[in-house]
């Protein structure tokens, strides 16, 4: 099943592929137009026109984008690793920001994975677990079953095994039974627990001991142990036991049933798990993690649907889900047997109303994931067992448990939780959303700056004026004023407000209407003031015009890096020292080029007067002033 499960491409991969195609078509079209205008209208030499067109293409293409995406994702993985989330695939970081459904295991992820035996029902009486009396026959048989139907080991140094089995061994030890290990070694045969039978059986000293789900176990019993005697198991007894089971389950407790019988054969088969003598029930509690309720609230606030998937009894599952806020009034709970009866279409129709899946097997998980994906959801699925691997691989974000998870599940997952904690997933989602926002803001910065250069070249081509930028200018702009501020924007920490946003769709484009309008608005404003400096310089000569246009565009784009950090005005967001550093480096290099005579010939820069340098500074500052005023007004009304 694992080999047959195909891993889907991440939303970031889809978005960037679509963005690249659209951008390439646009740039090629513009370069062809510029080449045509220069050759046939401006009467430029073909080689010169070709150099301008190629340089324009180089300037228009955001070469820094690939490195920005990689750097941002890499830094985010380091941050998430410190927060107990190890990312195996870089693209999975951003995919977390798209997650709209989280399918989580209950035990250990939403709960503390610290089982404690609480109640015992035997001899038709409910008693506290610490009131067992090993001198009573029923209690003695029950305590033996606790140890024999058990593969855990406990010592002063550590406990190894399933938390439920560890809790049963600890209860056994509370009664000064120091021979638990010796008793376990006297087991002769075992039928291990599996999710289909929901039973485990062992043989020891001519007896068969069985533990399992009470509703399943009762169907295998025809007698009941009362005061040391085996009596007929009546329907009234079964009803009383199931009522007690449901009452304990409603309190969020896990309930196990125990039975035994005499057994003299040398081979143990599944058909031997019949005609049993019912001994009693034990309830165990695994409290919800303290942080689970808040994490669930954060999920709902973020527009994410949290879902609990467990093998526990439906009543137990719903009780825990209610305590932490997953199961609300009007929600439904679906059992594995009910799931089997639904067609794929029926399941898809049920999905929005179901918040708890109980008594499910690992193969049910993959159906749930596929059904949600068919509805267009981005699904995160947790798992720890070998059989969970196909569902982890099928999901958009497979989340394996670092403590209790199998190596197979870790291999199939995109992310590993080193603390097995649901709240860690929510933290990772916040980071993922911030990553996408930073990448998008970096792209807006690159495109708006590139657009301003393209429009300047187009305007001068149509007006049959000298080109405002030489190829060396465009290359400097692309390497310095593009890369450093864009990388700094990608390092933005983000705000807590990002949690209040709804998850974006997997098909949402980077170049949507809103982004195109923003890029166009900002690019045109930068272009207007660049051309203003160009025309002022043109009064002197072409080289001065080109120098002033180059200086204005470089400085305007360096300042624009601060605008693209957020949709909020600068005074509402904390300082990003990476952006400050990028600006200082960029301005230092630009000043060196504009002032130092040694670089004038290399970059084709003329000697500029103080007045011309002041015009460059003012022209470069105005676009950012206008954009900041717009952000102030829009943030006040929004």
List each language-model region with its residue ranges.
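Short, hydrophobic transmembrane alpha-helix segments
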Residues: 539-540
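Generic alpha-helical transmembrane segments
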Residues: 481, 526-527, 546-561
């Amino acid at each position: 099943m694992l080999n047959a499960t195909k891993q889907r491409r991440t939303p970031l991969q889809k978005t960037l592929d679509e963005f690249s195609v659209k951008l390439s078509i646009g740039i090629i079209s513009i370069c062809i137009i510029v080449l045509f205008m220069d050759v046939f209208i401006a009467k430029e030499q073909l080689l010169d026109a070709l150099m301008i067109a190629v340089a324009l293409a180089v300037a228009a293409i955001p070469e820094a984008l690939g490195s920005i995406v990689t750097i941002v994702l890499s830094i985010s993985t380091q941050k998430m690793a410190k927060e107990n989330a190890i990312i195996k695939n870089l693209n999975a970081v951003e995919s977390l920001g798209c997650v709209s459904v989280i399918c989580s295991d209950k035990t250990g992820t939403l709960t503390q994975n610290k089982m404690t035996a609480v109640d015992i029902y035997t001899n038709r009486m409910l008693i506290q677990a610490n009131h067992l009396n090993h001198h009573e026959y029923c209690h003695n048989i029950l305590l033996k079953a606790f140890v024999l139907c058990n593969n855990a080991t406990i010592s002063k140094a550590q406990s190894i095994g399933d938390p439920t089995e560890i809790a049963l061994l600890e209860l056994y030890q509370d009664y000064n039974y120091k021979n638990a290990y010796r008793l376990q070694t006297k087991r002769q045969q075992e039928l291990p627990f599996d999710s289909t039978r929901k039973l485990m059986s062992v043989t020891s000293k001519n007896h068969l001991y069985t533990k399992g789900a009470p509703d399943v176990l009762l169907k295998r019993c025809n007698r009941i142990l009362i005061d040391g005697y085996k009596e007929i198991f009546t329907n009234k007894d079964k009803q009383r036991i199931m009522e007690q089971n449901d009452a304990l389950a409603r309190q969020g407790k896990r309930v196990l049933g125990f039975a035994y019988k005499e057994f003299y054969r040398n081979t143990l088969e599944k058909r031997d798990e019949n005609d049993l003598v019912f001994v009693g029930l034990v309830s165990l509690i695994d409290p919800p993690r303290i942080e689970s309720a808040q994490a669930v609230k954060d999920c709902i606030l973020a527009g994410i649907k949290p879902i609990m998937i467990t093998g526990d009894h439906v009543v137990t599952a719903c009780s825990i889900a209610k305590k932490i806020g997953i199961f609300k009034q009007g929600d439904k709970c679906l059992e594995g047997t009910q799931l089997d009866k639904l067609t794929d279409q029926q399941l898809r129709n049920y999905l929005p109303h179901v918040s708890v899946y109980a008594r499910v097997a690992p193969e049910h998980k993959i159906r749930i994931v596929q059904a949600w994906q068919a509805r267009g959801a981005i699904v995160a699925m947790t798992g720890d067992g070998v059989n969970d691997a196909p569902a982890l691989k099928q999901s958009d974000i497979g989340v394996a448990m670092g403590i209790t998870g199998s190596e197979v599940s870790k291999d199939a997952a995109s992310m590993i939780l080193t603390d097995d904690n649901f709240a860690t997933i929510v933290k990772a989602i916040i980071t993922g959303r911030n990553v996408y926002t930073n990448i998008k803001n970096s792209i807006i910065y690159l495109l708006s700056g590139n657009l301003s250069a393209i429009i300047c070249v187009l305007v001068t081509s149509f007006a049959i004026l000298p080109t405002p930028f030489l190829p060396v200018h465009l290359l400097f702009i692309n390497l310095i004023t593009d890369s450093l501020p864009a990388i700094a924007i990608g390092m933005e920490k983000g705000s807590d407000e990002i949690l209040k946003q709804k998850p974006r769709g997997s098909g949402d484009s980077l170049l949507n209407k809103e982004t195109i309008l923003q890029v166009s608005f900002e690019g045109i404003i930068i272009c207007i003031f660049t051309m203003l400096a160009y025309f002022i310089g043109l009064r002197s000569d072409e080289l001065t015009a080109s120098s002033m246009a180059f200086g204005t565009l470089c400085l305007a784009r360096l300042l624009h890096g601060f605008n693209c950090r957020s949709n909020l005005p600068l005074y509402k967001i904390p300082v990003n020292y990476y952006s400050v550093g990028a600006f200082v480096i960029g301005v230092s290099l630009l000043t060196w080029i504009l002032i130092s005579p040694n670089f004038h010939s290399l970059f084709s820069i003329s000697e500029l007067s103080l007045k011309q340098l002041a015009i460059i500074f003012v022209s470069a500052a105005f676009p950012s002033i206008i954009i900041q005023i717009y952000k102030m007004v829009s943030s006040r009304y929004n």
